[in-house]
């Protein structure tokens, strides 16, 4: 076996510039400088989508490595100091603890990591989204790895024809379950069609057993017990040679699907694929955005990124997303633009409702009954 490489993508919202729209250049410079000093990494890139900083790192220490997670945590702490100096909005909001405990999972930042033996050619895509939640990856990952109308390789590539194994997390019960596709396709859809609770964590090739994709599944609100911003997930997808081609991995985003998040994390909106220079959400703090950064790995070195969604081929998707956004905005505070009440539990909505609870009185349904015939006659 050859040497195994670990690709870690760890993200956090450290403070918005301006509001929730983007990241101040000084924060990116701080992250770059801190990672450059580390002896742990083979290579790294610092990116952002909206107001989230994404640390893309390669190393040889495997997933859940305490030293790598501590490095990312320290980067975010350094950036938080700069954010507070600049009085950026929500400085350090994704950091839910004051002390590092060996792993950033459960402490606020989102994490997607995979370890694999680098192939002869290793194309990967790092997807990063803003103003939405981890379930936003469910439909795209399903289409990439299970839908032959999206991925023709499932039909004609003998290395893909056997299908893929999906690992799904229940974010409420903290449980996981695996499905073997295509034979358990309908069973999978029972769960991933509810992306607020069930999220695709990882995908594995049934032909090779190798990992093909992994996503961050951290839910900030569930960890903090209050609304502290949307989760803004990341996802890593390996491509080609028995896995979806790059174009097959990008194709699901050509037709924007609806995701939860947007303004105050309380609305449904289209996930708009954008170039890196268009990733600052502004209209109603949105619509939700997704970027796609393509890399070739070479001995763990990151060659790239290629800004995939900057292509004019996605102009139509952006136009469609804007049209969907305009229609949904016309509904204002009404569902289905606003999230249903059960999904508003961790927003500020309960505080407003609590103020009014004493104004509710019981309804006597006997007063609502139809009058009997004799009562009508008496009148």
UniProtKB/Swiss-Prot annotation:
Binding-site residues for Mg(2+) 3, renumbered to this chain: 230-232
Metabolic or biological pathway, per its Swiss-Prot or TrEMBL entry: Carbohydrate biosynthesis; gluconeogenesis
Cofactor(s) listed in the protein's UniProt record: Mg(2+)
Origin: domain of life: Bacteria
Residues reported to bind beta-D-fructose 1,6-bisphosphate: 20, 89, 102-103, 131, 240-241, 264, 285, 346
GO biological process: one example: gluconeogenesis
Keyword set, alphabetical order: Carbohydrate metabolism, Gluconeogenesis, Hydrolase, Lyase, Magnesium, Metal-binding, Schiff base
Residues annotated as binding dihydroxyacetone phosphate: 20, 131, 264, 285
Catalytic residues in the record: 13, 227, 230
Binding residue positions for Mg(2+) 2: 51-52, 130, 232
InterPro entries (alphabetical): FBPase_V, FBPase_V_sf
Entry binding sites for Mg(2+) 1: 13, 20, 51, 93
Catalysed conversion reaction: beta-D-fructose 1,6-bisphosphate + H2O = beta-D-fructose 6-phosphate + phosphate; beta-D-fructose 1,6-bisphosphate = D-glyceraldehyde 3-phosphate + dihydroxyacetone phosphate
Residue positions binding Mg(2+) 4: 231
Function description: Catalyzes two subsequent steps in gluconeogenesis: the aldol condensation of dihydroxyacetone phosphate (DHAP) and glyceraldehyde-3-phosphate (GA3P) to fructose-1,6-bisphosphate (FBP), and the dephosphorylation of FBP to fructose-6-phosphate (F6P).
Family membership: Belongs to the FBP aldolase/phosphatase family.
Record note on quaternary structure: Homooctamer; dimer of tetramers.
Domain notes from UniProt: Consists of a single catalytic domain, but remodels its active-site architecture via a large structural change to exhibit dual activities.
Name of the protein this chain belongs to: Fructose-1,6-bisphosphate aldolase/phosphatase
Organism ancestry: Bacteria, Bacillati, Bacillota, Clostridia, Moorellales
């Amino acid at each position: 076996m050859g040497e195994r490489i670990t690709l870690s993508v760890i993200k956090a919202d450290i403070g918005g510039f301006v509001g929730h729209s983007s990241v101040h250049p000084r924060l990116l410079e701080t992250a770059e400088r801190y990672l450059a000093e580390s002896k742990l990494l083979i290579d790294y890139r610092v990116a952002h989508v909206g107001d989230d900083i994404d640390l893309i790192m390669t190393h040889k220490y495997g997933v859940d490595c305490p030293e790598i997670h501590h490095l990312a945590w320290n980067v975010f702490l350094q950036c938080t100091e700069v954010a507070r100096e600049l009085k950026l909005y929500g400085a350090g909001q994704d950091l839910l603890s004051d002390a590092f405990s060996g792993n950033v999972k459960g402490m606020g930042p989102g994490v997607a990591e995979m370890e694999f033996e680098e192939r002869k050619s290793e194309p990967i895509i790092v997807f990063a989204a803003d103003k939405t939640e981890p379930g936003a990856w469910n439909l795209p990952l399903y289409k990439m790895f299970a839908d032959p109308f999206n991925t023709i390789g499932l039909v004609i590539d003998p290395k893909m024809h056997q299908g893929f194994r999906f690992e799904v997390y229940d974010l409420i019960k903290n449980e996981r379950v695996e499905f073997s596709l295509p034979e358990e396709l309908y069973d999978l859809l029972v769960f991933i069609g509810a992306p607020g609770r069930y999220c695709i964590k990882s995908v594995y090739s049934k032909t090779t057993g190798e990992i093909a994709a992994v996503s961050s599944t951290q839910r900030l609100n569930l960890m903090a017990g209050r609304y502290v911003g949307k989760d803004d997930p990341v996802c890593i997808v390996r491509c080609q040679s028995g896995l979806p081609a790059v174009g097959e991995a990008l194709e699901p985003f050509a037709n924007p699907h609806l995701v939860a998040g947007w303004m105050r994390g309380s609305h449904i909106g289209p996930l708009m694929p954008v170039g890196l220079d268009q990733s600052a959400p502004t209209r109603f703090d949105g619509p939700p955005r997704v970027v796609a950064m393509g890399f070739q790995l070479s001995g763990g070195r990151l060659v790239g990124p290629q800004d995939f969604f900057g292509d004019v081929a996605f102009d139509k998707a952006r136009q469609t997303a804007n049209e969907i956004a305009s229609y949904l905005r016309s509904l204002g505070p009404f569902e289905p633009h606003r999230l249903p009440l059960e999904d508003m539990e961790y927003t500020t909505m309960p505080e407003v409702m609590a103020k009014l609870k004493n104004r509710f009185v019981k309804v006597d349904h006997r007063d609502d009954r139809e009058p009997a015939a004799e009562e009508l006659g008496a009148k």
